[in-house]
């Protein structure tokens, strides 16, 4: 079909005007028209079918969440150079940062060590220590693998891009892990897109880049008063009128199919229009929380103002995932950098934010488990970097890329374990250090994907892009 073909000229106009499809439908359905995607089958037997990706924007302090450091209390108020651990500042990573830490190494020796701002308790049969700010996640410790040795090379908030894509913010953009999953695997649902973003975005507003916009996440904003306004038929069009227009458009497409019998795009287009129509029923249904019991709603914190917003997002994630959405990413922390970026007021900031996410996150894990979904759903809880062991100002911590924590649970992940460690001050990942793409590699492995087989002509991937499976945490 040529550019002059009238059936190819205005697909978007037809969808939006003639058929009345909103913005939500457009991105998700156009993947059906892409010709060069893989066949959608896993490369080997998968252990998981879907991913729920929870990302805390701004930088969660590892020593106030999942990596206790009692030495911070022991040496509180002293400079790093006054402790037995002053050698942490000699590491080559500090000298090789592309975006340097604020101040030089000598300046950091003068920064006073900031004590932990909360306590830790042991949870579950595993006895893993978890912050008092995350007691509900603590109650799920035996289902979680805590990775305490993550590192990245960006010490600014562009690290949000790096954690999702594996590439530095200053490098040319490449697809994110969600886009690769969307590109590499076939659909589990005839009615929904395969990659959805709920809530605010990270620094990059796109996911797929050279894979094409068909593989970007479909952005979904949950509004209890009007949950899916932009996916309703436009211009006052009724569902019956939209169906008639759809049938007319499909007749035109089938006429074009007779004129161009060897063109596979036309049949894909017919299917994609049908998908967009079905989405207008399927998505609102997935977001209809009235179908859930009051007990389930309380499990996610929908009965509390502090947890309601994040709880709604996670409940939506569960409902979308059980309906076949492959990859759901949820960002927590508004603002340009992300609300977890507590350069000052860390105790007040982190304790408030943790109350927003702790109960709903634990509720998600417990709900997935009791429904039998956790065994084939990967849940990731991540952030772009940690925070410094030293103070910034009187009561905050600065960005820290050399060592921090994330956790994974669910499909194929061992529960009740920790992997890797940082040094006594939480400064460097010293045991089993993992670059951010090791998380990607682990997800790909569990989803049955060999990323080396997803190469796109003209876009050579680096070895660092693939990462290494964190073997110690998978079955």
Residues covered by each model-derived region:
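Ligand-binding pockets and gating/stacking loops
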Residues: 1-475
């Amino acid at each position: 079909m040529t550019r002059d073909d009238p059936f190819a000229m205005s697909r978007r106009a037809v969808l939006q005007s003639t058929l009345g499809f909103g913005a939500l439908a457009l991105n998700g359905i156009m993947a059906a028209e892409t010709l060069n995607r893989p066949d959608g089958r896993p490369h080997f037997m998968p252990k998981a079918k879907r991913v729920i990706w929870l990302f805390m924007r701004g930088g969660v302090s590892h020593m106030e969440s999942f990596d206790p450091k009692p030495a911070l209390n022991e040496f509180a108020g002293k400079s790093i150079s006054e402790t037995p651990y002053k050698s942490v500042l000699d590491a080559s990573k500090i000298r090789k940062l592309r975006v340097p830490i604020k101040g030089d190494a000598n300046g950091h020796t003068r920064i006073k060590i900031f004590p932990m701002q909360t306590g830790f308790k042991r949870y579950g049969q595993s006895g893993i220590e978890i912050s008092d700010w995350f007691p509900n996640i603590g109650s799920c410790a035996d289902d979680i693998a805590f990775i305490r040795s993550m590192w990245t090379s960006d010490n600014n908030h562009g690290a949000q891009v790096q954690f999702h894509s594996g590439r530095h913010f200053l490098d040319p953009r490449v697809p994110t892990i969600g886009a690769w999953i969307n590109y590499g695997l076939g659909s589990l649902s005839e009615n929904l897109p395969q990659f959805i973003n709920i809530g605010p975005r990270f620094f990059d507003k796109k996911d797929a880049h050279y894979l094409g916009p068909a593989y970007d996440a479909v952005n979904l904003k949950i509004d209890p008063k009007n949950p899916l306004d932009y996916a309703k038929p436009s211009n006052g069009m009724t569902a019956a009128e939209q169906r008639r227009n759809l049938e007319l458009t499909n007749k035109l497409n089938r006429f074009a199919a007779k004129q161009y019998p060897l063109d596979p795009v036309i049949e894909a287009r017919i299917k994609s229009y049908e998908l967009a129509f079905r989405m207008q029923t399927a998505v609102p249904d997935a977001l209809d929380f009235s179908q859930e019991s009051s007990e389930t709603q309380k499990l996610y914190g929908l009965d509390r103002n502090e947890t309601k917003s994040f709880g709604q997002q996670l409940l939506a994630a569960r409902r979308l995932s059980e309906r076949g959405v492959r990859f759901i990413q949820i960002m927590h922390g508004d603002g340009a950098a992300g609300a977890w970026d507590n350069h000052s007021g860390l105790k007040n900031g982190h304790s408030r934010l943790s109350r927003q996410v702790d109960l709903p996150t634990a509720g998600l894990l417990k709900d997935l488990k009791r429904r039998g979904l956790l065994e084939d759903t990967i849940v990731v809880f991540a952030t772009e970097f940690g925070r410094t062991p030293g103070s910034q100002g009187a009561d905050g911590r600065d960005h820290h890329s050399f060592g921090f924590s994330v956790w994974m649970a669910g499909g194929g992940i061992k529960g009740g374990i920790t992997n890797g460690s940082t040094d006594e001050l939480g400064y460097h990942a010293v045991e089993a250090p993992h670059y951010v793409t090791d998380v990607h590699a682990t997800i790909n492995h569990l989803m049955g994907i060999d990323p080396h087989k997803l190469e796109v002509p003209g876009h050579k991937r680096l070895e660092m892009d693939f990462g290494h499976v964190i073997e110690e945490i998978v079955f």
